[in-house]
Amino acid sequence: MPTEQNTNLIPASGFSQLATFQMEDMAEELNGLEGGFDRIKIPSGGMTVFEMPGETEDSPETVKEFSAVILYHHPILQYYREKYTGGSNPPDCGSYDGVTGVGTPGGSCAKCPLAQFGSGENNGKACKSRRRVFLLREGELFPMILSLPTGSLREFSRYIKRLLSKGRKSN
């Protein structure tokens, strides 16, 4: 006589418990630690590879290309009174929404003379437009940040428009 088989491998409630367990573990591990998201460095100055965070800060991984999912993206505006030479020094004025600048001069970005063409080097803008993209790579739990420079914004805009024209969002 055939016996009835139980096809329930894991009760549905087990998944939420597993997720809670993982979140609790992460919260415990991160308790008291500081730091933001790891950053992906875009090729510059003749380089042809991206610099990805490695196991340690001294051993980054270099790749020609990588795959990731866009979780979120937003505009950033940055104005440096002196020419920016890299490093982690904050801009004299910056905006994380592309609307309101914080710092000197601060205020409405749309009305700011530093956000107009002709205010910067080679008739460009003194206040540079960038795009911060939060990416999640396969096998990772935390997003990474890719900060797109002004020269990459046109192609990123085209990509987003292609997605939208197909009825899809980037995230």
Residue ranges and their predicted role:
Residues 128-171:
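Extended serine/threonine-enriched, polar tracts that run as long, contiguous segments within proteins
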Residues 1-141:
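OB-fold ssDNA-binding interfaces and closely related basic DNA-contact patches used
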